[in-house]
Amino acid sequence: MASILQAIRYSRGKLAIIDQLQLPYVEKFITIQTPEDAWHAIKEMRVRGAPAIAIVAALALASELNTLIVHDKLSSGAEEVKLFIREKLDYLVSSRPTAVNLSDAARKLESTISDHADTPGATGRTVAEAFIRAAEDMMTKDLDDNMRIGKNGAEWIIKHALAARKSTATVLTHCNTGSLATSGYGTALGVIRALASKKALEHAYCTETRPYNQGSRLTAFELVHDRLPATLITDSMVAALLANTKAEVDAIVVGADRVAANGDTANKIGTYGLAVLAKYHGVKFLVAAPLTTIDLGTKSGEDIVIEERPAAEVTKIRGPVDGDHSADIVKLETVHIAAKGINVWNPAFDVTPSTLIDGIITEVGVIEKGTDGQFHLERLFIDNSAS
């Protein structure tokens, strides 16, 4: 396996991200200096993936605060800076309301700066510096959590998903859950990377993931970058793949934008269909997500609001004209691929019922259902807080 892709570059006061709209044609970094830059990057899907958008949002605000400190333009009052940060966080959360990681990060950061603002002697600068440190710690923790998720998922698959005669796993994944969706390494794609590091990966399959093609554009890009054995398929080929005895798919591993208290999982559109197919074909279906993606305040999938995307994402497609580019310059063109006037329904996510999920891979272990056939995720947080 080659070196792992790095999609977020940060040093205090300086933040840059790979422009994912340019991938896989051009590997171009764009500078994010303000929360407004981050909001547009998230909304326009220049950065995507629940953990990544939370980190980029937090670091964008940290960068702006650092700039205000450097240029001596920050208010001296702790309360004023606290309110400034809260307003900016609320604005950033509005860029992608479905992603629980973003709202969870905002809530935790608000709590951190509120506590600091209430301490004796707090100033605007000390509150801002407390926020900057907390945002930087988020990125460090996310990468560490991803490595643990990868390890836990790989070990579970080797133990529970492989037939006795097999020592390597063939895994299917959906959308993009790697370095481009997180601080690095990835969640579901991190499991595939961990299998490869253990020399236990036979083959990886990634779906195209229509209509935004995160699989063909982003996951395929990461798999090729890391030189992992992999094959791209269209979404409609999954049933045929699982039925193919030569392919021998052992597990499907996906990410999550939100996991409800009962285990129902909102993820990229098409995930639900994969889970149904996995159940029919007897293939293990796993969700890989950090604890921050689990929302105990959301009781079930029925409570999850599903974002709808523009019709143009379905009726048009963007890419370079074949052969019309030089080494570093690619001109992207948009073409129509659907009949004009047709109505379009374009939900960004669907909800997979917990009954179709075999396990939820987290940084503290793989959570399976109890003897009653239900996930008890609340116990996970009790156990984790006590440890």
Swiss-Prot record:
GO terms for molecular function: S-methyl-5-thioribose-1-phosphate isomerase activity. It catalyses: 5-(methylsulfanyl)-alpha-D-ribose 1-phosphate = 5-(methylsulfanyl)-D-ribulose 1-phosphate. It comes from the Eukaryota. Its EC number is 5.3.1.23. Pathway: Amino-acid biosynthesis; L-methionine biosynthesis via salvage pathway; L-methionine from S-methyl-5-thio-alpha-D-ribose 1-phosphate: step 1/6. Keywords: Amino-acid biosynthesis, Cytoplasm, Isomerase, Methionine biosynthesis, Nucleus. One of its GO terms (biological process) is L-methionine salvage from methylthioadenosine. SUPFAM superfamilies: NagB/RpiA/CoA transferase-like. Its main location: cytoplasm. InterPro entries: IF-2B-related, IF-M1Pi, IF_2B-like_C, Initiation_fac_2B_a/b/d, M1Pi_N, NagB/RpiA_transferase-like. It is an enzyme of class 5 (isomerase). It is found in: Cytoplasm; Nucleus. The active site is at residue 257. Gene3D superfamilies: translation initiation factor eif-2b, domain 1 (1.20.120.420), Translation initiation factor eif-2b, domain 2 (3.40.50.10470). The keyword Cytoplasm applies. Pfam families: IF-2B (PF01008). The keyword Ubl conjugation does not apply. The record marks 175 as: Transition state stabilizer. One of its GO terms (cellular component) is nucleus. Catalyzes the interconversion of methylthioribose-1-phosphate (MTR-1-P) into methylthioribulose-1-phosphate (MTRu-1-P). Belongs to the eIF-2B alpha/beta/delta subunits family. MtnA subfamily. This is Methylthioribose-1-phosphate isomerase. The lineage of its organism: Eukaryota, Fungi, Dikarya, Ascomycota, Pezizomycotina. The gene is mri1.
